[in-house]
């Protein structure tokens, strides 16, 4: 969009420019005369001589003027310097850390005076003419007549706004190796060669510093922390607490069974032994069937005799009754397995008389006293009680027991173990039950 320019503004700007050009031309001529007067000093003495520091610290020593600029007069043409002279001037300026161009006064130049001093053939004059035209047009548009503002417009280009450094996102572990390999492939000296000429290398340097300082540190930290968090997460996922057991409710005996069958599909109950199952069944039977809640019964105390060989036999509770058929069959099986043991021992003894052998054959259905004592002593009854039982059942003093005597003696031992006392005589009903 073009801004319209009035005639008054245009004439005012032209008058200001002419006034500035006249003043700038006079200043340049004075400077040239001063430089030509100082150029009579030899170059070597001017460049390598050490001047004493001035007493006033605000006044600094003026640097030497090269002969090319000292011989400059109004209307002369600038000769292009060769490559060797430029290198020499650059080295001379770097050794003293002073740039020769920086000592010229910052005064605005007009197009007319510039063409009088610098020829139109030189490249520097053409460039300055283009910049002056640009600043003049800019001053006309905005109505600015400040020569210092015009000088700053062509002296240095406007700096670009700096980029805000944003923290790059943390790359994953897989991209860490690729980022490090790219950083290793970059050549740091190559990034600083052309910083004055182009801005691309400056951006590369900024990105490299960002990656090396913030992104690389964050990536390395994340790569070390990710496996530990993954391992912790996996461990926490595997270990889950067991579900709490359902609360036990007291009610009818059928209700817990139904509840147990319904919950079995959800949670597998622990395996119960036969004793625990029997105990639970007894507890359910003991529970009241009515809705009224009664105080729980105390647990039953089971007492055991610490000395099993000592039996408490009540004297008043005398054995009475008869031998049951099931008990009789059990006792007869024991007799059948142990009868006639003494006969075999007598027959194989060569020192025994033949009469004794014939008599032993008649005792084939008898059980020897040694065998009887061995069998009855396994009941852990006292020897005195066993002797009383032997006297009650043994009719013939031959040291052996018949079938009926052995069965009745076994029955009396069981009665003593049950807590009954021994009678003075065995009842006739008992003898009849074993015949």
Curated annotation (Swiss-Prot):
<dbReference type="GO" id="GO:0006897">
    <property type="term" value="P:endocytosis"/>
</dbReference>
<feature type="region of interest" description="Disordered">
    <location>
        <begin position="1"/>
        <end position="20"/>
    </location>
</feature>
<feature type="region of interest" description="Disordered">
    <location>
        <begin position="233"/>
        <end position="277"/>
    </location>
</feature>
<feature type="compositionally biased region" description="Low complexity">
    <location>
        <begin position="249"/>
        <end position="265"/>
    </location>
</feature>
<feature type="domain" description="EH">
    <location>
        <begin position="327"/>
        <end position="435"/>
    </location>
</feature>
<dbReference type="GO" id="GO:0005886">
    <property type="term" value="C:plasma membrane"/>
</dbReference>
<feature type="compositionally biased region" description="Polar residues">
    <location>
        <begin position="48"/>
        <end position="59"/>
    </location>
</feature>
<dbReference type="InterPro" id="IPR000261">
    <property type="entry name" value="EH_dom"/>
</dbReference>
<feature type="compositionally biased region" description="Basic and acidic residues">
    <location>
        <begin position="11"/>
        <end position="20"/>
    </location>
</feature>
<comment type="function">
    <text>Positive regulator of phosphatidylinositol 4,5-bisphosphate turnover and negatively regulates signaling through the cell integrity pathway. Involved in rDNA silencing.</text>
</comment>
<dbReference type="GO" id="GO:0005737">
    <property type="term" value="C:cytoplasm"/>
</dbReference>
<dbReference type="Pfam" id="PF12763">
    <property type="entry name" value="EH"/>
</dbReference>
<dbReference type="GO" id="GO:0016197">
    <property type="term" value="P:endosomal transport"/>
</dbReference>
<comment type="similarity">
    <text>Belongs to the IRS4 family.</text>
</comment>
<keyword id="KW-0443">Lipid metabolism</keyword>
<protein>
    <recommendedName>
        <fullName>Increased rDNA silencing protein 4</fullName>
    </recommendedName>
</protein>
<feature type="region of interest" description="Disordered">
    <location>
        <begin position="136"/>
        <end position="204"/>
    </location>
</feature>
<feature type="region of interest" description="Disordered">
    <location>
        <begin position="39"/>
        <end position="71"/>
    </location>
</feature>
<dbReference type="GO" id="GO:0006629">
    <property type="term" value="P:lipid metabolic process"/>
</dbReference>
<feature type="compositionally biased region" description="Low complexity">
    <location>
        <begin position="174"/>
        <end position="186"/>
    </location>
</feature>
<dbReference type="InterPro" id="IPR011992">
    <property type="entry name" value="EF-hand-dom_pair"/>
</dbReference>
